[in-house]
């Protein structure tokens, strides 16, 4: 399911985005952010992070560097070692 959700993002990045001027206020771009968020966090959490990011991408937001949050590590696996 995750791979299927990434297909439209890839299509946008390689077929549509090059035809438009760069308008994203953030680094990485919103499409890169969405791809990475879904790839790292899964469809639900990554999708939610992407929607929140798109909601912040507007002319009144200064933008800047906004990386995808790191995947939380499990405390139980680190304590088992």
From Swiss-Prot:
Keywords on record: Cell inner membrane, Cell membrane, Membrane
Keyword Cell membrane: yes
Compartment(s) of residence: Cell inner membrane
Main location: membrane
GO cellular component assignments: plasma membrane
Entry membrane topology: Peripheral membrane protein
InterPro entries named among the record's database cross-references: Membr_insert_effic_factor_YidD
Database matches in HAMAP family: UPF0161_YidD
Function, as annotated: Could be involved in insertion of integral membrane proteins into the membrane.
Stated family: Belongs to the UPF0161 family.
Protein name per Swiss-Prot or TrEMBL: Putative membrane protein insertion efficiency factor
């Amino acid at each position: 399911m995750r791979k299927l959700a990434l297909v439209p993002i890839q299509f946008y990045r390689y077929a549509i985005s090059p035809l438009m001027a760069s308008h994203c206020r953030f680094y990485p771009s919103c499409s890169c952010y969405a791809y990475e968020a879904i790839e790292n966090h899964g469809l639900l959490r990554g999708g939610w992070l992407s929607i929140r990011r798109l909601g912040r991408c507007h002319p009144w937001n200064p933008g800047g560097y906004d990386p995808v949050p790191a995947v939380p590590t499990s405390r139980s696996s680190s304590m088992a070692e």
